[in-house]
């Protein structure tokens, strides 16, 4: 066993009853792995939008201010009444953060499965990754090839498996093409590459000409700019050409989900040979999987007939539904294509302490396309 420190620096997020959110670092006792567990030195962990939902939640980050405790940084921000209602279930509980990461196994329980991972570079899933070390069951780690850069291994789960889950869902629900929003993101670029390899027509929605060029540059065929005056016309044309009847929306709020359903219906009506006042009988599905826009989701159901659905999508329930065989195949593909299809790009690397700099926190909480932060707990 590697000589280990006695404590493990860990990031915590706490909502206080008086209407404040506090994010801090705390030195906790170093965990000891049980027989079927491994202790991993966390070398890299991405900041994903799903992490930010827990990290800052409904806090007003424009009110964030800095302090210290035991020589470690603390961020405090005010939480408006609506945010307190949304986070009522976590008031008073200091929660750990970080869905995924990558590191080296430095200690292991005495089971053969755990011992076999000693010294290996592994990808991690299971929360509490914004820490120097993480102890977790062997089934929650995925061995990576020798020499894997921790920055590549850090994002093995959330974005790669979510993008693959989109194409699997498309097949399972008998669709043949996809519409995707916020498509210039790391996840969006992965989906472009997956669909190109698998021959799946993909309509990409972005919000600037610069993002159009990014996706065109990696081979995307259908890219439409939601800020353009002719957005709806171009979206309908792309859906007519592809036949897309399923969409995945990362924005969540606003009118985009409704616009996608409207465009799908317009494309379906073009194929109808007989008029119906109830609209087409083509089933149209949009799943919301993100919350980049925190405003209410708005749409007019009269715009897309009566054969449609709008729902939520989360990776974990999908994997439970898909089963071990499908998930195993997805994981193998991620490892096989880790430095190609599923390579993530980071604009900033920060330490645990740097992540609690107020200006830095406000920057990564803005969730700007093209900006992705990687936490390196050991520098």
Where are each of the predicted segments found?
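C-terminal substrate-binding/catalytic core of Rossmann-like NAD(P)-dependent dehydrogenases/reductases
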Residues: 232-236, 240-241, 290-348
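A structural motif shared across PLP-dependent enzymes of the aminotransferase-like
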Residues: 126-139
């Amino acid at each position: 066993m590697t000589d280990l420190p006695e404590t493990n620096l860990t990031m915590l997020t706490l909502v206080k009853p008086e209407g404040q959110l506090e994010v801090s670092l705390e030195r906790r006792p170093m965990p000891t792995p049980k027989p079927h567990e491994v202790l991993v030195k966390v070398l890299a962990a991405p900041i994903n939008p799903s992490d930010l939902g827990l990290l800052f939640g409904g806090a007003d980050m424009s009110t964030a201010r800095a302090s210290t405790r035991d020589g470690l940084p603390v961020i405090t921000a005010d939480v408006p009444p609506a945010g307190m209602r949304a986070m009522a279930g976590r008031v008073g509980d200091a929660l750990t953060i970080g869905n995924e990461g990558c590191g080296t196994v430095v200690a292991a329980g005495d089971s053969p499965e755990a011992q076999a991972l000693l010294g290996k570079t592994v990808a991690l899933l299971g929360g509490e990754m914004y820490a120097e070390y993480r102890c977790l069951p062997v089934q929650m780690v995925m061995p990576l090839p020798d020499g894997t850069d921790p920055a590549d291994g850090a994002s093995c789960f959330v974005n790669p498996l979510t993008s693959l889950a989109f194409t699997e869902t498309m097949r399972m629900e008998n669709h043949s093409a996809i519409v995707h929003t916020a498509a210039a993101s790391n996840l969006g670029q992965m989906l472009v590459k997956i669909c190109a390899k698998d021959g799946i027509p993909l309509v990409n929605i972005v919000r600037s000409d610069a993002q159009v060029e990014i996706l065109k540059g990696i081979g995307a065929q259908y890219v439409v700019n939601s800020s353009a005056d002719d957005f709806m016309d171009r979206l309908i044309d792309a859906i007519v050409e592809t036949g897309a009847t399923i969409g995945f929306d990362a924005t969540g709020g606003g009118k985009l989900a409704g616009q996608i359903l409207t465009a799908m219906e317009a494309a379906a009506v073009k194929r109808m040979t007989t008029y119906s006042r109830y609209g087409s009988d083509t089933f149209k599905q949009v799943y919301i999987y993100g919350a980049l826009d925190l405003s209410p989701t708005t749409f007019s159901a009269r715009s897309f007939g009566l054969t449609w659905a709008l729902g939520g999508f989360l990776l974990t329930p999908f994997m439970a539904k898909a089963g071990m065989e499908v998930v195993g195949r997805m994981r193998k593909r991620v490892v096989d294509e880790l430095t190609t299809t599923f390579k993530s790009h980071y604009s900033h690397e920060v330490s645990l302490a740097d992540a609690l700099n107020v200006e830095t926190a406000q920057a990564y909480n803005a969730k700007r396309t093209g900006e992705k932060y990687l936490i390196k707990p050991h520098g």
